[in-house]
């Protein structure tokens, strides 16, 4: 199976939009975060990602709605795209916002809707890439919640200012108020060079 680079992400989404139109399905608005958004917006140097992560959907009234579950027709056509392009079956998924513990379900950063970058893939598919500052929020939470590795690597490349990292840390703590989460978060901030921020949270 092929990983997704910027060209493959573009190709997959373009084909998805075309197939949605042929099937007379949609339109769908997808808010995308994670590696696919970082790569497509040129925010990081890493070249590939495993999948396209759907954070939320946007309805015809331009409101955010839950992506759990994703529409069956969207999943069916995404599977066809996977077969055509030799991609993983779950290349398009709602992993970040699945079930009660998901990012959408816990609450998104204030004002996120006004910071999205829009891309149209035909008349039936619109993708909204999450902004740099919102990626910082999500990466801070993910690095503590599921472990460092690529999350911290991405976070370093996003080069947050002390003010940005502090706001992201405070937001992350609203999603997990445990002492353990705060301790791991503070340790990570110190390792990243934000000692003063770690002492304030």
Annotate each language-model stretch with its function:
Residues 1-201:
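Compositionally biased terminal segments of proteins
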């Amino acid at each position: 199976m092929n990983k997704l680079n910027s060209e493959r992400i573009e190709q997959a989404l373009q084909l998805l939009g075309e197939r949605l139109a042929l099937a007379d399905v949609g339109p769908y608005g997808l808010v995308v975060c994670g590696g696919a958004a970082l790569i497509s917006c040129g925010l990081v140097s890493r070249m590939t990602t495993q999948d396209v992560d759907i954070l939320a959907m946007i309805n015809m009234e331009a409101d955010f709605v839950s992506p759990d579950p994703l529409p069956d027709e969207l999943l069916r056509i995404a599977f066809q795209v996977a077969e055509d392009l030799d991609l993983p079956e779950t290349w398009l998924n709602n992993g970040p916002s699945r079930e009660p513990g998901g990012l959408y379900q816990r609450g998104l950063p204030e004002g996120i809707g006004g910071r999205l970058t829009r891309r149209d893939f035909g008349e039936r598919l619109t993708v909204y890439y999450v902004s740099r500052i919102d990626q910082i929020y999500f990466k801070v939470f993910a690095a503590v919640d599921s472990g460092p590795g690529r999350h911290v690597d991405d976070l370093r490349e996003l080069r947050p200012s002390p003010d940005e990292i502090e706001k992201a840390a405070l937001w992350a703590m609203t999603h997990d108020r445990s002492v353990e989460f705060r301790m791991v978060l503070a340790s990570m901030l110190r390792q990243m060079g934000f000692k003063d921020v770690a002492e304030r949270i």
